[in-house]
């Protein structure tokens, strides 16, 4: 099944101030991309601002995944998984990503 356009809608799901906050948190290793298509805290907790920004982006991503699933006749989880694979693959050097085994890895 081809999932065309998964990356572009995901990008639109993370606009504005929330993206800037999360990008900074990614650079610091506080937040990372997961293989299931959502952002997560790498360990422990983060500031309320970081958690709110991460949650905002995850809510927007879920909405995009749900819309794409309706359009393509698949599940939101399937769309999220395909998107997650792409987001993990695009992570920048030094950022953390959570793989399918649940372990965090630093991108080299």
Residue ranges and their predicted role:
Residues 54-69:
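Short, well-ordered alpha-helical segments
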Residues 1-5:
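Bacterial N-terminal signal peptides
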Residues 10, 53-54:
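A generic structural signal for short
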Residues 6-13:
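Sec/Tat signal peptide C-region and signal peptidase I cleavage site
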Residues 15-52, 72-108:
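Amphipathic, charged alpha-helical segments and their helix-to-coil junctions
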